[in-house]
Every structure is written in C-alpha cells, then in structure tokens.
Swiss-Prot record:
PANTHER family referenced in this protein's UniProt entry, alphabetically: BIFUNCTIONAL POLYMYXIN RESISTANCE PROTEIN ARNA, UDP-D-APIOSE_UDP-D-XYLOSE SYNTHASE 2
Residues bound to NAD(+): 347, 368-369
Protein name: Bifunctional polymyxin resistance protein ArnA
UniProt keyword annotations, A-Z: Antibiotic resistance, Lipid A biosynthesis, Lipid biosynthesis, Lipid metabolism, Lipopolysaccharide biosynthesis, Multifunctional enzyme, NAD, Oxidoreductase, Transferase
Source organism (scientific name): Escherichia coli O17:K52:H18 (strain UMN026 / ExPEC)
Catalysed reactions, semicolon-separated: UDP-alpha-D-glucuronate + NAD(+) = UDP-beta-L-threo-pentopyranos-4-ulose + CO2 + NADH; UDP-4-amino-4-deoxy-beta-L-arabinose + (6R)-10-formyltetrahydrofolate = UDP-4-deoxy-4-formamido-beta-L-arabinose + (6S)-5,6,7,8-tetrahydrofolate + H(+)
GO molecular function: carboxy-lyase activity; UDP-4-amino-4-deoxy-L-arabinose formyltransferase activity; UDP-glucuronate dehydrogenase activity
HAMAP family xref list: ArnA
Region Dehydrogenase ArnADH, annotated ranges: 314-660
Protein encoded by which gene: arnA
Site positions for Transition state stabilizer: 102
Length: 660
C-alpha cells in the first residue's frame, strides 16, 4: 500500500519503522530541519529516510500548491503523520483514497494541540496514552481508530514519560497498521464536549511562581526536566534552573519564596514547600541542592523571585494610538488595573479617557497622527508594545469618503508599522472581520478562509482591502525582517462608549448606536435591505480581556499569530438586534422620557449608504486560535451587552427638554 509520511522526532522514526515492518511502500517522507535552538535528544527522520533510501523533503510550507501538486503525483493510497509539527491542508488530506491518519500523544479528545506530554505532567495527570486518529481539517479532531492507555507514575518526568509513550506507540502501530492496510478498522467519533486543547509551550512558560502550591511547582519541574529547558527562578538577577524536586507537605509556615533551610534546600510555597534536589546556577553545572544554595549565596530567610529583580521594577510601556476610541479607552482601563503597565496615548479628543488623565501611569497627548509624526516615532522607539488603533471603521464612510479611509487606515498606519520594524518593537495590529469579505465558510478561519471582496467599482471594500494589505505587509515584515507581531480581528464588539449619539446623527456610527439614536429621537429604525444580515456580537469586556492576554503574550504564544476575537454563540440578524434593543428600551426606567417607538422601516442599502455598497450576509468567527494562544472563551451573553450599552447611552442624553 503506497503512502506518503509526514514525520519528526522519535515518534516519526518509530512510525516509519512500523510502516516498513507492516509492508507499506513509502513514496516520500516530509520532515523538518532541526532548530539550532532546540536540544535534539531525539532520532533524525531525515537520517533514517536517507539510510532507507526513501526520498525526504523539508519544505518551509508543505501546503504550498507546488508541494500539493508534487504529492498528488505520488498517488498515495493512504497518508500518515507522526509528530509532524505543522497542520496539513485539506487538499493534501483528500489525496489519499483510504484517508489520512495521525499519531497523537494523548488520550483524545483530551489534550488536543501541542506538547501533550508536557501538559499532562504540568497538570498532575495520572494517566495518558497515544491515539491514532483519522485526520480532518481541524487539528486532532478526527475519529479515533485506536488508543492505548499508560499510567503516569509519581516519579515520571518528561523523558521517562516520553519513553513510555514511544513504547506504547510501537505497540499501537504494530496492532493497527495491518488493519488499516486491509480496510478493517472501527472508528469512534470524538466526544466534543470532553475535548481540551493546549497550545505551544516555550521555556518562558516554566518559571516557578512560589505563591502556588508545592505540588503544582513539582509537577512543573517534572514536565520540563532535562532534556527540556527546565523550570527556573531567580535570586535577585541571577537565574537558576531546578532539575529535580520533592514536595514537603508539612513544612514550617513561611512567606512564599522564602528559603526555609539550605541543607536540604527547601523553599516555602503557597501550600507546603519544595525541596530543590538538583539544580544549576546560570549556565553552570548541575549540582545537589545544598551546593546550589551555597553557590547562589542563599541562607535561611533569603527570598527568591519569579523574574529578575530589575525586570520586576520596570513597567511595560504600551503606546496606544487612538486611545480615546472605543477599544483604546477600554483597553487603557484594563491595563491600568494592573500595576505593571505604563500607557502612552495619542488622540484628537479626550472625552472617553478623561477619567484616566490624572493617573500616574497614563500619559496623554492630544493630536493627530498625520501631524504628530515626530512624537509618534519617538514614542514607538521608547515603548515596548505598539497598538495603532486609529482608523475610520464606519461603513457609511467607506462609500462617502473612500480616499480619506485609504489615507488614514492604510498610509498612516503603514508609516507606524515601518517605525516598529526600524526600532524592532512589538506591534499588535487591529485587523478586522471585514477582511473576510464575502467568504462563504460557515466559520471564518484565520489560517484557511479565503478573503473575498467585490469589484473595484464597489468602494465599500476599500476599508477591507486596506486592512488586508496591511495584514500582508506586517506578515511579510515578520517573515523577512523578524518583526514581532500579532494581528487581531474583532467581530462586532459592542458596549458603552461605542461611538456616540452625535456621530450617529450624521450616520457615522456602528449599528447599535444608530438604533439607539432612532429610539431616543422617536424616528423609525431603518433595516438596511430588511436587516437579515447576521453578525456575531461580542461584549467589549470579552474582547478587551482577549486583547489584554495578547499584550501579556504568555510564553510568546501570540507571536506571528492572527487571532479572531468574537463570540460565535452571539449570532443575530440586525433585525433581531433591533428587536432585542427595543425590548430592553421599553423596560428601561428612563423610558418615559423618550418619544413613542416609530416602528421599523425597510430601506435599500443604496439609498442609505450610497452607490458602491455591498453587504455581507453572515460573519461568524472560528476562535480556535484564541482558545489555543490565549486560553480564552467569550462569556457574556448578548442581551446583557445590549442592556448595558443602551443604559450607558440613555444616561448621556440631556433629559431637561424631554417629556416626563
């Protein structure tokens, strides 16, 4: 049976050996070049392929159409993936009549995603296993073909568990590969309600937070012990690594991070104490705990910290351009709630941020980004993170002022992007759900959905294509010049301070603000083309929490990622939004101050937006990247958002001349 194999690591080597032993004909093997920054303790798939006389390739992007075509020419009957690190596109998966199968190092549907071996140890699991499953477009979600369970012993560390998983994988493949070859397999669908998903781990994820229980920290040590990078902490600015540890449940009470004793080296935790059995100071040699204490100059009562002492004193400087806008002012509030951010902001007004102007860690300048270029360049250079939130993002302006949209949204932002490249600063760029345009996918996916817009004579797409081109420019700068970036795509965020009623009076506002103005003034609610267009509305608090986690960037998981931020469960048509808003309005305690409801009125989009407008029937996000990179889920129901948004705007209305 002819197969094409995607493989890496020890699991890749044993998978190839198992296929050959089962009589499969391997036409080609796709693998990865080794990362020089990664400790290669595992077998080489490339070397094994060469020794076996099998063609082997390591393309940067195996999903490129040229590689898809080359794989198609190999006419594989079945495809296998053994610890290949990139998602394989659906076009490749569909090439094999018998399907594609992946070996995953957990008991699916638990621990989908990356580094399951390390995550099960971090989380203190007592059981894991290996799963062979059918590959589908969504990672690790296909039907299960075979599973083998293994126990995790209390003294297991990452490398011993790795060896157990390899042994189990050999057994599983020996039992299952002949059945696949003869088309004699039983597949069991995964239970989605039991699925968990985890993202990539980096060395920075393994710092020891002493306020946590000793058992949690011990599990961290087990999960990243040699040959992984190790768990670490600091004495002042001196980093040290913990290679092995032991939990003491009944240690004397002390402040977390305090040294209880040096022989043995015992550190107080949030619950219990952690004995450092072996460790390493800086880039030195491994030594026992008592010697490590001596090397680090520790005595009873010394304090350890989770980050360098100098780093702990310096706040992260965040530059927000457009700080007075809807996202900018809510994000400022979230950042200032913590004690480790310094926020620098620029905008043409300050009404929404007036509550922060006296905050010691908020620095505001009133100005226009097209004029204050020197100030902007200086602050890009000065700050750590840059968020250029300035944009014209109201649909009526796309047809009314397309050139102004292009000049501000594209040209001014491109200049800021180039400053970030010049000074090597991290940029978090607000893309938009508009870039998906008229995509027909059920869920708009950051990595796979096509971005489809209308013809040139429809100027409403100038905003979408301006943002899309900036996305592509940022991506290219990341690939070619090492720009550290994250693109985020908001899906219809709503909440207090979204636009204002004066903007709605001239038609330059988002949908809910316009609808609220209609209710306040007693004018008919206009349903553009019947209001059947569906959107997924997201509470600003949910959106800002996701954006805050992007700024935090735990373990650098957001670097180089595109992340939809939306609530796929809060889908409603504009007509349904209007009905929900009306119901909330009729129950509001200030209702009697406003005129009677004037009804709904259906209008054509051309009469409202002008010629050159096209609408989009649906726009629902896939949020798998947000789940993977941010451990984030939207929580707030749409009705709650509507109630709070309406209440905010009604309380801004001058009621002195309103009927009571």
């Amino acid at each position: 049976m002819k197969t094409v194999v995607f493989a890496y690591h020890d699991m890749g080597c044993l998978g190839i050996e198992a296929l050959l032993a089962a009589g499969y004909e391997i036409s080609a093997i796709f693998t990865h070049t080794d990362n020089p920054g990664e400790k290669a303790f595992y077998g080489s798939v490339a070397r094994l392929a060469a020794e076996r006389g099998i063609p082997v390739y390591a393309p940067d992007n195996v999903n490129h159409p040229l590689w898809v075509e080359r794989i198609a020419q190999l006419s594989p009957e079945v495809i296998f993936s053994f610890y290949y690190r990139h998602l394989i596109c659906d076009e490749i998966l569909q090439l094999a009549p018998a399907g594609a199968f992946n070996l995953h190092g957990s008991l699916l549907p638990k621990y989908r995603g990356r580094a399951p071996l390390n995550w099960v140890l971090v989380n203190g699991e007592t059981e894991t296993g290996v799963t062979l499953h059918r590959m589908v477009k969504r990672a690790d979600a296909g039907a299960i073909v075979a599973q083998l369970r293994i126990a995790i012993a209390p003294d297991d560390i990452a490398i011993t568990l790795h060896h157990k998983l390899c042994h189990a994988a050999r057994q599983l493949l020996e039992q299952t590969l002949p059945a696949i070859k003869h088309g004699n397999i039983l597949e069991i669908a995964q239970r989605e309600n039991e699925a968990t998903c985890f993202g990539r781990r980096t060395p920075e994820d393994s710092f020891l937070e002493w306020h946590k229980p000793a058992s949690v920290l011990h599990n961290m040590v087990r999960a990243v012990a040699d040959p992984w990078p190790g768990a670490f902490s600091y004495v002042g600015n001196q980093k040290f690594t913990v290679w092995s540890s032991r939990v003491h449940s009944h240690a004397p009470a002390a402040q977390p991070g305090s040294v209880i004793s040096v022989a043995p080296l015992l550190i107080a935790c949030g619950d219990g104490a952690l004995e450092i059995v072996t460790g390493q100071a800086g880039d030195g040699i491994t030594m026992q705990g008592s010697q490590l204490a001596q090397t680090l100059g520790l005595v009873q009562g010394s304090r350890l910290n989770s980050q360098p002492a100098c780093a702990a004193r310096r706040r992260t400087r965040v530059l927000i351009l457009g700080v007075n806008g809807f996202i900018g002012n809510h994000l400022t509030e979230r950042l200032l709630r913590e004690d480790h951010y310094e926020v620098y902001g620029l905008d043409i007004g300050s009404d929404a941020i007036s509550r922060f102007l006296n905050h010691p860690h908020f620095h505001f300048v009133e100005g226009d980004i097209s004029i204050h270029s020197e100030w902007i360049e200086y602050h890009v250079k000065k700050c750590d993170v840059v968020l250029p939130l300035v944009a014209i993002a109201t649909p009526i302006e796309y047809t009314r002022n397309p050139l102004r949209v292009f000049e501000l949204d594209f040209e001014e932002n491109l200049r800021i992007i180039r400053y970030c490249v010049k000074y090597r600063k991290r940029i978090i760029f607000p893309s938009t759900s508009e870039v998906y345009g008229m995509c027909s996918d059920k869920y708009f996916d950051e990595d796979h959905s096509n971005l489809i817009v209308g013809p040139v004579n429809k100027p409403r797409w100038i905003y979408s294509v301006s943002k899309q081109l900036l996305d592509r420019v940022i991506w290219a700068y990341g690939e070619k010049e090492g720009l550290q970036f994250t693109l985020f795509r908001p899906f219809n965020w709503m909440g207090p301070r979204l636009d204002n009623l004066n903007a709605a009076r001239i038609g330059s506002s988002r949908a809910i603000t316009q609808l609220i103005l209609n209710l306040v003034e007693g004018s008919p609610i206009k349903l553009i083309d019947g209001g059947k267009q569906k959107r997924c509305f997201t509470d600003i608090r949910d959106g800002i929490e996701a954006l805050y986690r992007i700024i935090e960037n735990a373990g650098n998981r957001c670097d180089g990622e595109i992340i939809n931020i939306g609530n796929p469960d809060n889908e409603a048509s504009i007509e349904e939004l209007g009905e929900m808003l009306l119901a909330s309005f009729e129950k509001h305690p200030l209702r009697h101050h406003f005129p009677p409801f004037a009804g709904f009125r259906v209008v054509e989009s051309s009469s409202y937006y002008g010629k050159g407008y096209q609408d989009v029937e649906h726009r629902k996000p896939s949020i798998r990247n947000a789940r993977r990179c941010l451990d984030w889920e939207p929580k707030i129901d749409m009705q709650e958002t509507i109630d709070e948004t309406l209440d905010f705007f009604l309380r801004t209305v001058d009621l002195t001349d309103k009927p009571s």
